[in-house]
Amino acid sequence: MQFRIEHDTMGEIKVNDSQYWGAQTQRSLENFKIGTEKMPKELIGAFAKLKRSLAVVNHKLGKLSLEKSQAIIKACDCILKGELCGEFPLAIWQTGSGTQTNMNLNEVIANKATEILGGNFREKKLIHPNDDVNMSQSSNDTFPTAMHIVSVLEITHRLLPSLENLLKTFKEKSQQFKEIVKIGRTHLQDATPLTLGQEFSGYASMLEHSKQQILESLEHLRELAIGGTAVGTGLNAHKELSEKVAEELSQFSGVKFVSAPNKFHALTSHDAIAYAHGAFKALAANLMKIANDIRWLASGPRCGLGELNIPENEPGSSIMPGKVNPTQCEAMTMVAVQVMGNDTAIGIAASQGNFELNVFKPVIIYNFLQSLRLLSDSMESFNIHCASGIEPNREKIDYYLHHSLMLVTALNPHVGYENAAKIAKNAHKKGISLKESALELKLLSAEDFDKFVVPEKMIGPKA
């Protein structure tokens, strides 16, 4: 391996000659050999979009030459095309402002841009990482800006489409199952009837609410910290920079961004991300409930509830032949647990904004993006391999419906609550039907029982 000598304000350091990064990236590699968690590639892409937009705006504001601006833009485009994916090796366990990752971008872009201009960055840098690529910026405003950019883009292009697909499936199932009357359950005990379609409409409504909560959180994430520089005052930045960068980013990405109205808030608080992740946690709670319901309703095949049949995707046991497990449900419930854990980490980290800067930024965005990725992937997997293939087991559904003691609830208006309870308890004690119990207790005639206890008429309010 060949090395070259790079330098920064702390002196010289050896860098692998095949890499584009410079001294500060190398120091971070050597000083923070912690864990395996690296800066997410999605965040690097958001950073490249930001640096690209800044190069455009700094030229328009007369601060950066056209030649340098175009070279930086082309270098950023190389990153966005995936041509430099091996140049961003830093751990998330670094400075809490993300300074080393900001400089990683600056160094790689500067050296690539120098090359684009026909220079040799090993001998002389035609583009400076701080003076040109980082012009009018601080890590303190670029990193939180990149956090918001990647959050908005990933929610828009990844999370919401997956959520929409699963929501569509449950809406379709709700219609498909609307005529199937089944017994309801509360407290894990038998309750009054409803339709399977009504049950699935509840799942669809949960996901619709989660979607709206996430969309609402997006409006806060659109606000960008750029232009605040070191502490929020905008020192060394043009007064029009923040607005113009938001406009340029919006145009380039096709997604709306705006300048944060208060940069002091934008640098020291990550309440927008904590709020958005709160919506992720609420979605995770809904997914946990849905997955648990489905795996319980599909339990069996002979000794469980067995009201639903789910797709058989793979063998379920290494010792029990023929066993098939609700694996998609299990995977999604584990994802939900991870998201809830991430929410705790993000909430604690977001509370640590001391004075003018929060210095827990890398761990916040790492956990945020992990949750987003897991939720997106698990919903897509669950939809394709489980939800879309759910079918009712009519025989089991009808059996439970007509053997439930809670059908006695329909008798409340006719014999009163206490007498209805006597009918149910007597039936349960003697192992007889509700009808037989009512006749034995002489509380109803057979004709009246058949008229009052009709499960199909118990699935909604009466006029």
From Swiss-Prot:
Marked site (Important for catalytic activity) residue numbers: E330
Alphabetical UniProt keywords: Cytoplasm, Lyase, Tricarboxylic acid cycle
Enzyme class of the recorded protein, top EC level: lyase
Residues annotated as binding substrate: 97-99, 128-131, 138-140, 186, 318, 323-325
GO CC terms, sorted: cytoplasm
Record field: catalytic activity: (S)-malate = fumarate + H2O
GO molecular function, one term: fumarate hydratase activity
Active site: H187 (proton donor/acceptor), S317
Localization annotation: Cytoplasm
GO terms for biological process, alphabetical: fumarate metabolic process; malate metabolic process; tricarboxylic acid cycle
This protein's pathway: Carbohydrate metabolism; tricarboxylic acid cycle; (S)-malate from fumarate: step 1/1
Signal peptide per UniProt: none
EC number, as in UniProt: 4.2.1.2
Something else known: There are 2 substrate-binding sites: the catalytic A site, and the non-catalytic B site that may play a role in the transfer of substrate or product between the active site and the solvent. Alternatively, the B site may bind allosteric effectors.
Assembly, per entry: Homotetramer.
Function comment: Involved in the TCA cycle. Catalyzes the stereospecific interconversion of fumarate to L-malate.
Protein name according to UniProt: Fumarate hydratase class II
